[in-house]
């Protein structure tokens, strides 16, 4: 695949997810992303079973290079500033004020690179009454109103992956790409501020729009009821999911697949608005029917009747599906020290060519000597 950002260099002073995720998206598009880490321990996400190559770290740090620098030490700070001088983008996800303490504030970096795109990711924002609060994923989900859309109402507990972290990283990468596009026309850099609160509020746009427009406060079942989305356990213990939306043909197809015409004529379910109002009853009616056949059998019946559906896979099944295998979503590469690395490729395909090339996440300071040599050569050429 074409490496769209191959001529851009990104210096990432990021930890955990938001900063590294932003860097990963740019690296997936071909940028030379150099991860600057603390000597000895590196990104805190590295730590795992006595080692420094955790699955969490691997998730967000492929296609990058690593250099270990203690920017509180004058020698390493100079290397860091020399590195930033070669960069197009700088990413950090510290609390406000911390970057300045380690020589990575915007003012310091503008002195060595005036055209830099400087991206600062925070939890609650660069200013305001909550600016100094520590924030992790669940806090941002909660503050943005999103957590309530995922929380089981009968037994409140946090479920699901780190959506706020991942979403913030995606928005940061999008903003960076926009700033780089502008810079190709103006030659000027930008400061990009993005908080997890703002990112998740935008991601939660549908919920806010419903409230602004009709005064409705959406809950975890609001969208599934209106969209007529369902998931059921089959006779083999595996799950299936389907989404009917509003076209009548999908409901009609479901009734045929079920083989229970009485469900289609039941006044509680015969019309879409009735199905929305009585979704719990409809679930109760369908659940025992789905337990009569295996998931494979139900997929065949729903497919024959053109009902939008899929097996509800676990992660050990999803990429073995024929369509996923056809698309080549799973890719593998070898790290000289850590061995085989398997991941999910970037979702982009430019000019019909998906990107199946991937570099394993670097070990701590894996490219330190290489990067220092590059900087020394650059300095020598400059005289």
Where are these regions (language model features)?
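Oxidoreductase and adenylate-handling cofactor-binding alpha/beta cores
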Residues: 169-189, 202, 206-212, 255-260
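Conserved Rossmann-fold dehydrogenase catalytic segment
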Residues: 126, 153-163, 184-198, 219-224, ...
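Terminal low-complexity tails and localization/encapsulation signals of metabolic enzymes
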Residues: 1-8, 233, 317-383
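Glycine-rich beta-alpha junction loops
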Residues: 40, 124-125, 196-201, 236-238, ...
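Aromatic-enriched alpha-helical interface/lid elements that frame and gate functional surfaces
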Residues: 228-305, 309
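N-terminal helix-loop segment corresponding to the beta1-alpha1 unit
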Residues: 1-175, 179-185, 363, 367-383
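Conserved PLP cofactor-binding pocket of PLP-dependent enzymes
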Residues: 303-324
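Mid-domain beta-loop-alpha active-site segment that forms a flexible
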Residues: 162-177, 196-204, 246, 250
């Amino acid at each position: 695949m074409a490496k769209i950002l191959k001529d851009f260099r990104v210096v990432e002073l990021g930890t955990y997810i938001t900063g590294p995720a932003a860097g990963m998206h740019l690296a997936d598009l071909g940028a030379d992303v150099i991860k600057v880490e603390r000597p000895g321990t590196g990104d805190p996400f590295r730590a795992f079973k006595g080692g420094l190559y955790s699955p969490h770290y691997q998730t967000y740090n492929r296609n990058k290079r690593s250099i270990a620098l203690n920017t509180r030490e004058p020698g390493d700070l100079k290397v860091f500033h020399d590195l930033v001088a070669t960069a197009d983008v700088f990413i950090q996800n510290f609390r406000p004020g911390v970057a300045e303490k380690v020589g990575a504030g915007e003012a310091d970096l503008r002195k060595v690179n005036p055209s830099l795109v400087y991206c600062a990711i925070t939890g609650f924002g660069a200013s305001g009454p909550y600016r100094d609060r520590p924030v992790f994923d669940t806090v941002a989900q909660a503050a943005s109103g999103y957590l309530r859309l995922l929380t089981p109402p009968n037994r409140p507990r946090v479920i699901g992956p780190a959506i706020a972290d991942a979403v913030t990283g995606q928005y940061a990468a999008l903003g960076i790409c926009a700033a780089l596009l502008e810079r190709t026309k103006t030659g000027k850099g930008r400061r990009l501020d993005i908080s997890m609160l703002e990112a998740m509020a935008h991601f939660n746009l549908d919920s806010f729009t419903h409230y602004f427009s009709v005064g409705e406060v959406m809950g975890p079942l609001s969208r599934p009821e209106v969209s007529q989305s369902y998931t059921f356990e089959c006779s083999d213990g595996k799950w299936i999911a389907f989404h009917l939306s509003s076209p009548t043909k999908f409901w009609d197809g479901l009734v045929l697949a079920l083989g229970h015409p009485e469900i289609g004529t039941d006044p509680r379910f015969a019309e879409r608005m009735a199905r929305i109002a009585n979704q719990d009853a409809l679930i109760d009616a369908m659940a025992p029917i789905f337990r009569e056949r295996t998931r494979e059998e139900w997929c065949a019946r729903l497919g024959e009747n053109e009902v939008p559906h899929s097996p509800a896979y676990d992660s050990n099944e999803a990429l073995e599906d024929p369509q996923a295998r056809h698309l080549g979503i799973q890719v593998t590469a070898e790290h000289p020290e850590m061995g085989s690395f398997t991941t999910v490729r970037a979702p982009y395909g430019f000019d019909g060519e998906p990107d199946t090339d991937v570099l394993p996440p670097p070990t701590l300071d894996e490219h330190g000597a290489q990067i220092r040599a590059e900087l020394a050569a650059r300095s020598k050429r400059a005289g």
